[in-house]
Amino acid sequence: MNILVINAGSSSLKYQLLNPETGALLAKGLCERIGIDGKFTYKPQVEGKQVLDAVDVAMPTHSEAIQAVLNALVDKDNGVIGSMQEIDAVGHRVVHGGEAFAGSVLITDEVMKALEECIPLAPLHNPANITGINACTAVMGKDVPQVAVFDTAFHQTMPAKAYMYALPYEYYEKDKVRRYGFHGTSHKYVAGRAAAMLGKPIEELKLISCHLGNGSSVTAIDGGKSVDTTMGFTPLAGLPMGTRSGDLDAGILEYIMGKYGYDIKEMVSILNKKSGVQGVSGVSSDFRDLEKAAEEGNARAQLAEEKFAYEVKKYVGAYAAAMGGVDAIIFTAGVGENDKGIRAMVCDGLEYMGVKLDPAANDVRGKETVISAADSKVKVLLIPTNEELMIATDTAAIVKGN
C-alpha cells in the first residue's frame, strides 16, 4: 500500500511516498517558493534514480506543486511508481483539530467545514493545510481517499484538570480557550516504538516523551494515552525553545509593553521569534551553535543550555508525579536524538527517581537504542521520530477501515 504524505505550508509543500506496511520510503522532497518562482526537490530512494535538487518549476499555486510531485513520482526514467493509480491514499498533516477531532479522520465535505472552523485556533497553519487538501482534490480527483492527521488529536485524551486554564470559565465555553498540545503525531509514534522496545503492551506503561528540537514539548503518556503536555493553547507554551519563550509570567508582557511602547503583535513576535535559547544566549537558536559557543566559554550559551535542560527536567519530575511513576523516558526530535550533552543534563539528578544514564550508551546520535544503565529502574530511550510514517500508518488504517 502506497501513501502520499503531504505537509503543506503557505508557500511550501513537503512530501513523502511511503509504504506503511513495510516502512519503506520510496521518495521524498520539497516544493518551495510556491506562488513566487517555484523550486522543486525530488529525492527517490530507489537506486539508479536521479535526484532533482531545487530545480525551477513554475508553481503559481499548490495545485501545480502537487502536479509536479505526481509527475516526478511517475516519470518513466526517474519515477518510483508506474502510475498515479499506485497511490492508494493521501495523508495530510493538519496542525489543529481543536476539540472536534480526537483522532485522524477521512476527509469529507463535513470534515472540511470543521477544519475551516478551526482556523481561528491556528491562523498561520490551518489555512495552508486546507489549501494542500484542496490542491490534491483538484489534481487527483475525489476518488483518491484523503485523511487528515492532527498534531493536536493525540492530546484530546487529557483530563479537564490538565487542559483547563484557571481563567473565567466562559472563555473555555464560548471561545474554546484551553490547553491543546502539539507534536502529538511524534509523541504517539515514539510511545508505540517504546512499547515495542520494552516488550510490553503500551496499556501497561507510564512514559514521558521529550520531543526536543527547535520546537520542544514534553508529554505524559499513561497507558498509551496523553494525560498532560507542556505546549498549550498555542505552541508558545511550556519549555523554552529555539526562539520561543515557553512559559512566563503574563505580567511581564504588560511591563515590557508599557516600558517600550510595543503593541500586542510586536510583543507576541518577540515571544515567538526572539526569545528561547536564542534570546538568552544571544548566539543562535541552533543547539549545535550553542554547544560550540558553550565549549568556548560563552557564559550566556552555557546558561541557555542549562536553562533548557532544567526546564525539561522539571517537567519530567512533574509528570512522574502526575502519573504516580514512570517506566521510561524517551528522547526524540533534532536535539533529543543528537545532543548527548542535553540528554545527560536532563537525567543528571534524577537518580532518586530510579534514572541512571549509561555515559557510553548515551554517546550516540539518531539511533533507536536504550541509553540507560542495565540496573536503571527507569529506562531511558533514544527513539528517532518518524511523523511521516505515523501519518502514513494512520491513513492506511482509516482507509482500510472504511
What is the predicted function of each stretch?
Residues 8-9, 92-95, 212, 326, ...:
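Glycine-rich beta-strand-to-loop/alpha-helix junction loops that act as flexible
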Residues 302, 306-322, 326-327, 336-402:
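Internal helix-turn-beta structural module
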